Amino acid sequence: MKLKGRKIVGGKAEGELIVSQKPLSFLGGVDPNTGIVTDAESDIRGQSIAGKVLAFPRGKGSTVGSYVIYALKKNGKAPKAIIVGEAETIVATGAIIAGIPMVDGIDVSKLKSGQRVRVKADEGLVEVEE
């Protein structure tokens, strides 16, 4: 399955998906030292985003969330790529400063955790292995 979106941050990544169907706050919602989702309201609470392709509808919360994304990258606990339904400033800024490929305009309800994907962010393309 190929899904077409829009490039936010260029680059390529391939890996296992971790998908949340709920908005995600990085400040207080993801531990920057471990990559574990800690948000009590998250449907992926307790799971690690480190080294995976992270998909969720949109970000929420404080602007400091951008720096949490950057800290994840510096600590080697960042996702390989980010896929969102709607890019908002907090997550987009974090992906930009961390250099994490990011695509928006993707219907994340079509994605499932555990699937393997290729993100070709320069083309705004997400390819899901079937």
Swiss-Prot record:
Its EC number is 4.2.1.182. Keywords: Isoprene biosynthesis, Lyase. The active site is at S62. It catalyses: (R)-5-phosphomevalonate = (2E)-3-methyl-5-phosphooxypent-2-enoate + H2O. It comes from the Archaea. It is an enzyme of class 4 (lyase). It holds the Pfam family AcnX_swivel_put. GO terms for biological process: isopentenyl diphosphate biosynthetic process, mevalonate pathway. The keyword Lyase applies. Pathway: Isoprenoid biosynthesis; isopentenyl diphosphate biosynthesis via mevalonate pathway. HAMAP family: PMDh_S. Heterodimer composed of a large subunit (PMDh-L) and a small subunit (PMDh-S). Belongs to the AcnX type II small subunit family. This is Phosphomevalonate dehydratase small subunit.
